[in-house]
């Protein structure tokens, strides 16, 4: 490829990014919940899979498959006392998941999931491509949810995924989360419009119907 061709290709890519930023983008996200009184379904776990809580002592382990930027982000999560777990496969950190907790001020995860004194939200979950298909994600969701319910007074945990992300959608339902609603979102030039709101946590004698 000539230098002119490379230059032209770069110009085209920049124009595409610019045009893309000007076009409103519509997302459809499935929002799920699990309540303190619900039963979580722990999936089978292979002998080489271990789930540990993230602490100052093992925080650095995530460098085995994530970069320095992610490590620094996790330092911030730990400093603000969010709860995280690492999945270890064959002795190596190969997955992570975090739960956002309320610390006295209003907080939204992803701009639409509310965190308050009664509700936590699971976010920033990932599994190394080399270790997918081993129910790693499902095991992390269950262990993290148990940690949150055991160590905080929250009554509900929320999690969301794109409606077309079938592997995540299926994994979330299999461990015991139920779908609360489908949330359409319009994003445009840094702004976000939600077309529905997350219901407040139900009382112990009230049922929320599936959407």
Residue ranges of predicted features:
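Acyl-donor-binding surface of acyltransferase catalytic domains
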Residues: 1-74
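Conserved catalytic-core motifs of GNAT/GCN5-like acyltransferases
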Residues: 32-33, 178-192
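Conserved acetyl-CoA-binding loop-helix of GNAT-fold acetyltransferases
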Residues: 124-129, 133-148, 170-174
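Conserved active-site alpha-helix within GNAT-family acetyltransferase domains
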Residues: 163-181
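Acidic, metal-coordinating catalytic segment for phosphate/diphosphate chemistry
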Residues: 200, 207
């Amino acid at each position: 490829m000539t230098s002119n061709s490379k230059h032209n290709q770069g110009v085209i890519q920049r124009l595409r990014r610019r045009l893309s930023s000007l076009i409103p983008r519509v997302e459809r996200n499935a929002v799920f919940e699990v309540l303190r009184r619900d039963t979580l379904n722990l999936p089978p776990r292979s002998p080489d899979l271990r789930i540990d809580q993230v602490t100052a002592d093992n925080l650095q382990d995530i460098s085995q498959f994530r970069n320095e930027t992610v490590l620094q982000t996790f330092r911030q999560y730990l400093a603000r006392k969010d709860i995280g777990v690492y999945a270890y496969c064959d002795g190596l950190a190969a997955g992570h998941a975090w739960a956002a907790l309320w610390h006295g001020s209003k907080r939204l995860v992803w701009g639409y999931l509310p965190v308050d004194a009664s509700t936590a939200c699971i976010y920033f979950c990932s599994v190394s491509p080399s270790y997918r298909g081993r129910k790693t994600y499902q095991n992390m969701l269950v262990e993290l949810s148990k940690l949150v319910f055991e160590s905080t007074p929250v009554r509900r945990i929320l999690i969301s995924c794109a409606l077309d992300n079938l592997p995540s959608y299926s994994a979330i339902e299999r461990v015991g989360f139920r779908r609360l609603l489908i949330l359409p979102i319009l994003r445009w030039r840094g702004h976000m419009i939600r077309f529905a709101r997350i219901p407040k946590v139900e009382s112990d004698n009230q049922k929320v119907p599936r959407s």
